[in-house]
Amino acid sequence: MRGNIAQLMQQAQKMQENLQRAQEELAKLEVTGSAGGGMVSVTLTGAKECRKVRIDPSILSDQEMAEDLIAAAFNDASNKIDAESKDRMGSATAGMQLPPGMKLPF
């Protein structure tokens, strides 16, 4: 029984180290989302901080369209980060499923 507990503790520590490494990698990550066939692009960090917005000047005359495309590009980048985060955190936890509603990073 003690051997099993010690082994579980080692696995938990390794998983914690893997999660820390994955979180550090995600913090350095930059992802670009786009909309309108590339007329708008938004670059976010892994922490979803906006780094850059590029807008094709031809859409600036239509404010509503520009606003919609900026929001869509932001959402595209955000979804890409979510997918990358899920993939990296899944690898870090060795595929161990988290309870429903629990998200990483904690």
UniProtKB/Swiss-Prot annotation:
GO cellular component, one term: bacterial nucleoid
Disulphides: none
Record GO terms (molecular function): DNA binding
Cytoplasm among keywords: yes
Region of interest: Disordered: 81-106
InterPro entries associated with the record: YbaB-like_sf (IPR036894), YbaB/EbfC (IPR004401)
Superkingdom of the organism of origin: Bacteria
Subcellular location: Cytoplasm, Nucleoid
SUPFAM superfamilies from the UniProt entry: YbaB-like
Alphabetical UniProt keywords: Cytoplasm, DNA-binding
The UniProt record lists the keyword Ribosomal protein: no
Main location: cytoplasm
Subunit note: Homodimer.
Stated family: Belongs to the YbaB/EbfC family.
Biological role: Binds to DNA and alters its conformation. May be involved in regulation of gene expression, nucleoid organization and DNA protection.
Listed NCBIfam families: DNA_YbaB_EbfC
Record-given protein name: Nucleoid-associated protein XCV1128
